[in-house]
């Protein structure tokens, strides 16, 4: 009996120590937390902790958008994942932002990078297409069982960034929006309540920050949370190539609001946030509430 009691005591102690490991208490409290505790190196990395795969969705098999490519974690051992639909800019195709697919998916998300119905579609059309893509992803796609349909986000570049704001204004149940050097004729987004990350570029002559990104950010007075990152010395087309600063803030934003993962707030609100040489201007509503 004494031996059994001793063994039981050892097991209880071991379990207590296991639960006390970094991230364990948070994981128990937050069922949406995915992956190990993040570091600055891990959010900057070209690949995260999850192995990924991808599948092509033909435009002939869908309606409301132009098909695309789905990037997703291969393992579901940690459960389902939040998802984000991504739209390219004016005259561009999914290939222009394809680098975001495996980079974000490997951090624990299902990423659907879409083609638009036509490459000339305007922001409002792109917003509608982003929502159609999310609907397809969660109801008809072959990876729908991997997706938590309550944890969805939108992202886009240029007119796709404008489409991101259009989509989040139309569907306030979205968990997050990430607009990359966004362009839109609409300047007032005061009714948009979705937590929004706006990424502008200092030398953008297509969508100058003074008439696009900054007014967009300032008008988001109803958004529960918002952050503005301006890329130092960058042009409108910075999101078309792998960019560590864009990835760092986009991943952290999605983790914070799609996964409710406060472990990533340090990269948005910590002492080093916005102080990188690659950032020219940084504005935020920190501390953040997800």
Describe these PLM feature segments.
Residues 79-89:
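Short beta-strand element of the alpha/beta-hydrolase
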Residues 232-233, 240-290:
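Alpha/beta-hydrolase-fold serine-hydrolase catalytic core, especially in secreted/extracellular enzymes
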Residues 95-115:
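Short amphipathic alpha-helix adjacent to the substrate-entry channel of hydrolases
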Residues 28-79:
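N-terminal cap/lid segment of alpha/beta-hydrolase-fold proteins
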Residues 207-218:
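Short alpha-helix in the alpha/beta-hydrolase fold that links the catalytic acid
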Residues 192, 198-200:
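Short beta-strand/loop motif that positions the catalytic acidic residue
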Residues 75-80, 122-162, 263:
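Gly/Ser-rich "nucleophile elbow"/oxyanion-hole loop immediately N-terminal to the catalytic nucleophile
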Residues 203-208, 236-237:
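Acidic catalytic loop of the alpha/beta-hydrolase fold
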């Amino acid at each position: 009996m004494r031996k059994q009691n001793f063994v039981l005591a050892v097991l209880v102690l071991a379990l207590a120590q296991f639960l006390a490991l970094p991230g364990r208490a948070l994981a128990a409290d937050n069922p949406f937390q995915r992956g190990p505790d993040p570091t600055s190196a891990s959010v900057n990395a070209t690949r995260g902790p999850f192995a990924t795969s991808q599948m092509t969705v033909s435009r002939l098999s869908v309606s409301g958008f132009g098909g695309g490519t789905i990037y997703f974690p291969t393992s579901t051992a940690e459960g389902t994942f939040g998802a984000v639909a991504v739209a390219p800019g004016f005259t561009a195709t999914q290939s222009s932002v394809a680098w975001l697919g495996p980079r974000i998916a490997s951090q624990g998300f299902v990423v659907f990078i879409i083609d638009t119905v036509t490459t000339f579609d305007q922001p409002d059309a792109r917003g509608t297409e982003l929502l159609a893509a999310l609907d397809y992803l969660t109801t008809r796609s072959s990876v729908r069982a991997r997706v938590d349909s309550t944890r969805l986000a939108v992202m886009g570049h240029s007119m796709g960034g404008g489409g991101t704001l259009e989509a989040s204004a139309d569907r306030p149940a979205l968990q997050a929006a990430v607009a990359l050097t966004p362009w839109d004729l609409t300047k007032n987004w005061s009714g948009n309540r979705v937590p929004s990350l706006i990424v502008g570029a200092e030398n953008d002559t297509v969508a100058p920050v003074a008439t696009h990104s900054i007014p967009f950010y300032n008008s988001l007075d109803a958004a529960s949370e918002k952050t503005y990152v301006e890329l130092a010395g960058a042009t409108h087309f910075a999101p078309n190539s792998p960019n560590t600063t864009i990835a760092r803030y986009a991943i952290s934003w999605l983790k914070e609001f799609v996964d409710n993962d406060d472990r990533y707030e340090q990269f948005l609100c910590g002492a080093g946030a916005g102080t990188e040489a690659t950032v020219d201007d940084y504005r935020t509503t920190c501390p953040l509430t997800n």
